[in-house]
């Protein structure tokens, strides 16, 4: 990554750099957690990750703390997306009662009645039409209920919305929360000043979504492992017949360009040497393991084979910094999860600093049972991808610098 961008974000002031005593604090958290149809939360990681900043403000005697978050993509007010569904879990994890405010006006009333150190959760901020438009009126309203604005929602830091950007124009003090700081420090450790050799593991289904990342990262890394359906397009660029495998035909020449550029910059790219293939993803009665160039007619590659697994594990072992973005096979189907899981075990066995991009990658690491053995797992999917692409995230641009 171009050092300037990440260094600029690394110099953001955090809540530890200011005094919150007797001040009204508004924290933009990310409580956008997955739930089942009965509104039971299946993974509360995002709530847990927000606790250190909330507790820091309580311990340092903030007058009151307003928590602001979105949940899903509601179109207007919709009970299905109410943050009431997460209130009990937040109370349990925080170990205290939390007042619930249906509206911003309601927050003001609660602030006047509340005792010092009380916590208020505002209803889903996306119920306000102006939120995603970064509307000035909503931004000023939010700023009016706080003396200090803290952004701790890394997962939405690539979005220029009222609660992540607009509010900062009107709030008296604007700083990063402890999670936001931890995220940017981890990315800086992996990209701005990494221990070498640096390895990028990149997967997922689309080359198109990882193009900017690949071009940007060639200046940072020493080697790249490309897996998942993405690797099919690169294997085709090397002249292999990929049969029925998912290939982005319009990007084969782009893949060739990346391979050439990597060679020019002396970055070694590793692709699968053998693959697991099937003629039917749903039924998968017929499964074959063949060299990558010998996929049987009518079959599609769905995972890396054992020789690739061994090769990739050796590459991992010889790395000091590992950045991983995107799973390397259809890990949700047990029969095709071995490649991704084996690699997760290999990464956990190293002493390297491992930075895991959010979203599907974090989910795959979870399913492999290796969450606790990674150095840092990002809470943001889209946000972490944009950082790897070398972008400055909008939410960081509006916060105060040291």
UniProtKB/Swiss-Prot annotation:
GO MF terms held by the record: ADP binding; ATP binding; phosphoglycerate kinase activity
Primary localization class, coarse: cytoplasm
GO cellular component, as recorded: cytosol
Reactions that this protein is recorded to catalyse: (2R)-3-phosphoglycerate + ATP = (2R)-3-phospho-glyceroyl phosphate + ADP
Positions of ATP binding: 210, 332, 358-361
Highest rank taxon of the organism: Bacteria
Pfam families per record: PGK
Keyword line: ATP-binding, Cytoplasm, Glycolysis, Kinase, Nucleotide-binding, Transferase
Cellular location(s): Cytoplasm
Residues that hold substrate according to the record: 30-32, 46, 70-73, 126, 159
EC category name: transferase
Involved pathway(s): Carbohydrate degradation; glycolysis; pyruvate from D-glyceraldehyde 3-phosphate: step 2/5
UniProt record, GO biological process: gluconeogenesis; glycolytic process
EC number: 2.7.2.3
Family to which the UniProt record says this protein belongs: Belongs to the phosphoglycerate kinase family.
Binding partners and assembly: Monomer.
Protein name: Phosphoglycerate kinase
């Amino acid at each position: 990554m171009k050092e300037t961008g990440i260094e600029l974000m690394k110099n953001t002031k955090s809540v530890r750099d200011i005094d919150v005593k007797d001040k009204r604090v508004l924290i933009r958290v990310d409580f956008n957690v997955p739930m089942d149809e009965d509104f039971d939360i299946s993974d509360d990681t995002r709530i847990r990750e927000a606790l250190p900043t909330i507790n820091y403000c309580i311990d340092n005697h903030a007058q009151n703390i307003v928590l602001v978050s979105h949940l899903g993509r509601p179109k207007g007010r919709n009970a299905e997306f109410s943050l009431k569904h997460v209130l009990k879990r937040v109370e349990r994890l925080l170990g205290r009662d939390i007042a619930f405010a249906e509206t911003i006006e309601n927050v003001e009333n609660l602030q006047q009645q509340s005792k010092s150190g009380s916590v208020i959760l505002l209803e889903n901020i996306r119920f306000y039409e102006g939120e995603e438009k970064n509307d000035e009126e909503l931004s000023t309203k939010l700023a009016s209920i706080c003396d200090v604005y803290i952004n701790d929602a890394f997962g939405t830091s690539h979005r220029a919305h009222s609660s992540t950007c607009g509010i900062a124009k009107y709030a008296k003090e604007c700083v990063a929360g402890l999670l936001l700081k931890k995220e940017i420090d981890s990315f800086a450790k992996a990209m701005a000043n990494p221990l070498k050799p640096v390895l990028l593991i990149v997967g997922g289904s689309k080359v198109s979504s990882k193009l900017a990342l690949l071009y940007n990262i060639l200046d940072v890394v020493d080697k790249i492992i490309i897996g998942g359906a993405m690797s099919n397009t690169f294997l085709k660029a090397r002249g292999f017949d990929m049969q029925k495998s998912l290939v982005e035909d319009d990007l084969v020449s782009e893949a060739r360009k990346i391979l050439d550029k990597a060679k020019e910059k002396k970055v070694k790219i590793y692709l699968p040497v053998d693959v697991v293939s099937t003629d039917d993803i749903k039924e998968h009665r017929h499964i074959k393991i063949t060299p990558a160039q010998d996929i049987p007619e009518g079959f599609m590659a769905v995972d890396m084979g054992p020789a690739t697994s061994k090769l990739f594990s050796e590459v991992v072992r010889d790395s000091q910094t590992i950045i991983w973005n995107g799973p390397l096979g259809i890990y949700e189907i047990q029969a095709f999860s071995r490649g991704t899981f084996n690699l997760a075990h290999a990464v956990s066995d190293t002493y390297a600093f491992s930075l895991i991009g959010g979203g599907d990658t974090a989910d795959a690491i979870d399913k492999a049972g290796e969450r606790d053995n990674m150095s840092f797992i990002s809470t943001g999917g889209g946000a972490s991808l944009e950082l790897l692409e070398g972008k400055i995230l909008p939410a960081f641009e509006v916060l105060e610098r040291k």
